[in-house]
């Protein structure tokens, strides 16, 4: 094939209206893919951070439970010991036990809230990642539409992109 024939063939392909439409569609899908991918990564990060915070709260809860247990033991020991000083110490340790029980309940509640936040972020991340997959498939099918010059492939790509955007948009419906 001569250089002139090759240039004419490229010019013919460049003027193909389907290729232009598919190319524009690919650009739009790529922009949507970027938005969905970044959103998915943000949700995954949020999920992991919330889970780590919940884990920290549970560790704090265990530390408070240990202190409560030690104060309870100390109170029992002081109650068994005769004397005014021992009675005062026993009362002090009983107050500590009450304080640690109350703090433990608050910490436990906070840990459960963080676990719930993590679960919600995880659900959102999964939907965004599936949306990302459908958008990636749409780009591949757009490429096939350009190569095969078939409108059916272009329409399939648009449907795949619609599914991807739709799945991604459902993150706004996840409340718990």
Q: Predicted segments — roles?
A:
Residues 1-25:
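N-terminal positive-inside, membrane-proximal cytosolic segments immediately preceding the first
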Residues 7, 21, 137-176:
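Juxtamembrane interface at the cytosolic side of transmembrane helices
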Residues 12, 37-126:
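Cytosol/matrix-facing amphipathic helices and coiled-coil assembly/linker segments
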Residues 25-38:
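Hydrophobic membrane-insertion alpha-helices, especially the h-region
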């Amino acid at each position: 094939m001569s250089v002139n024939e090759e240039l004419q063939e490229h010019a013919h392909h460049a003027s193909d209206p389907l290729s232009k439409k598919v190319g524009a569609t690919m650009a739009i899908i790529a922009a949507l893919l970027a938005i969905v991918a970044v959103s998915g990564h943000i949700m995954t990060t949020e999920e992991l951070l919330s889970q780590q915070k919940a884990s920290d709260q549970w560790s704090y809860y265990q530390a408070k439970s240990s202190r409560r247990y030690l104060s309870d033991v100390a109170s029992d020991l002081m109650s068994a010991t005769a004397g005014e000083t021992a009675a005062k110490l026993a009362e002090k340790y009983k107050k500590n036990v009450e304080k640690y029980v109350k703090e433990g309940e608050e910490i436990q509640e906070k840990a459960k809230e963080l676990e719930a936040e993590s679960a919600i972020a995880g659900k959102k991340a999964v939907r965004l990642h599936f949306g990302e997959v459908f958008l990636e498939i749409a780009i591949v099918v757009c490429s096939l539409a350009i190569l095969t010059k078939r409108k059916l492939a272009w329409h399939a790509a648009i449907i795949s992109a619609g599914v991807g955007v739709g799945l991604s948009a459902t993150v706004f419906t996840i409340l718990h």
